[in-house]
Amino acid sequence: MPRIQVLDIRGSKESVGSTPHLRAAILEGLLKPPGSRTLPSETLYDEVGLKMYNDGMKAWAEWYYPVEAERQILERYGRDIAKLFTTSAKGKAVLIELGAGSLDKTSQVLLSAAEITRTTGPMNNIAYYALDLERGELERTIGRLQEVIGDQIAGKISTAGMWGTYDDGIRVIEKNELELEPDIPVHILFLGGTIGNFSKQDGDVAFLKSLPLDHKRGDTLLVGMDRHKSADAIERSYGFAAAKDWIMNGLKVSGRVLTGDEGLFEIGNWERYAKYNEELGRYEAGYKSQKEHALKISEGVDITFLKDEVVLVMFSNKYTDAEMDSVVDSAGLVKNGSWMDEKAQYCLLSLRANNGPV
């Protein structure tokens, strides 16, 4: 097996995802008035949380429709999608996946790209980088990727990790820290419907605008968006058993980051909150206080939670077709192509800057 290369691209120890930054974000959310308190979703993705999430997705893929829908799209339309990964005059390109997770879905993307790529010698034409917050999980998942499809992509696609945040990845592209030749296009993968974790028609647009897509060299973005559907269907799909343990692990992470004590948030004082918010068109998850109780974080910092108060830790937007079009247009992007699963539950979009080549 090839050596697993992981680039440390973290901008600084104070960057997003670092303990000092995460502690500040946790405090900021908890010091809001009751009824509007939050915990950052990063608390769900420590090494333990990532493994719980990835294992849960595999075990409950039948119920958690985004996994099956995205897999179906990539298997059915993978070659069409890969054909939109433009290359340089020498046939080279870079793929960077933001928030790579388990890489299961990525395998099909890379297999499709390998099928259509041409080789000009012993060097790999396409370089794939998986970006994520946890180095250990990156090494584990890239190692697994190499075990499963390494022989099929050998000589065509190289694989490596990027240890850092979305912002770090964006900086690497903007400042060309990979030292790419000017005409080598960069194709960003943002799969899993993760764009729905930003505020709708606001944070999602701002994030897409922040992506440095260079139209002159043919950069693209492949993004997954979850389509609007009934509340019952959504709540049922998120109701798998592992989801509770995964969400509750966020309280342990928050306690550890705040004071070093994973038991700071007594689990008995909380239950998992999970509900589809019809008004905002999003699934919400977090914690519901079982009784009024106080939490002492440090000298002079005490927080009282009310009975039945909800603290949100994550949400996932579900988009109507009109909302998808609005987000894309507002971000200054245009579609190269779009694909849906057979039940029309989920959509993959290939996007480029609106002044890019047709």
UniProtKB/Swiss-Prot annotation:
One Pfam family in the UniProt entry: Methyltransf_33
GO terms under biological process: methylation
Enzyme category, top tier: transferase
UniProt keyword list: Methyltransferase, S-adenosyl-L-methionine, Transferase
Single GO MF annotation: methyltransferase activity
Temperature dependence: Optimum temperature is 25 degrees Celsius.
Coiled-coil spans in chain: none
Top-level lineage group: Eukaryota
Transmembrane feature ranges: none
Catalytic reactions on record: L-tryptophan + S-adenosyl-L-methionine = N(alpha)-methyl-L-tryptophan + S-adenosyl-L-homocysteine + H(+); N(alpha)-methyl-L-tryptophan + S-adenosyl-L-methionine = N(alpha),N(alpha)-dimethyl-L-tryptophan + S-adenosyl-L-homocysteine + H(+); N(alpha),N(alpha)-dimethyl-L-tryptophan + S-adenosyl-L-methionine = N(alpha),N(alpha),N(alpha)-trimethyl-L-tryptophan + S-adenosyl-L-homocysteine + H(+)
EC number of the protein: 2.1.1.-
Family statement: Belongs to the methyltransferase superfamily.
Function: Methyltransferase that catalyzes iterative L-tryptophan N-methylations to produce L-abrine (N-alpha-methyl-L-tryptophan) and N,N-alpha-dimethyl-L-tryptophan. Also catalyzes a third methylation to yield L-hypaphorine (N,N,N-alpha-trimethyl-L-tryptopan), an agonist of the phytohormone indole-3-acetic acid. Can also N-methylate the non-native amino acid substrate 4-hydroxytryptophan, but the ability to incorporate trpM into a functional psilocybin biosynthesis pathway is indeed thwarted by the inability of the L-tryptophan decarboxylase psiD to use N,N-dimethyl-4-hydroxytryptophan as substrate.
Entry-linked PANTHER family: ERGOTHIONEINE BIOSYNTHESIS PROTEIN 1
Protein name per its UniProtKB record: L-tryptophan methyltransferase trpM
Organism: Psilocybe serbica
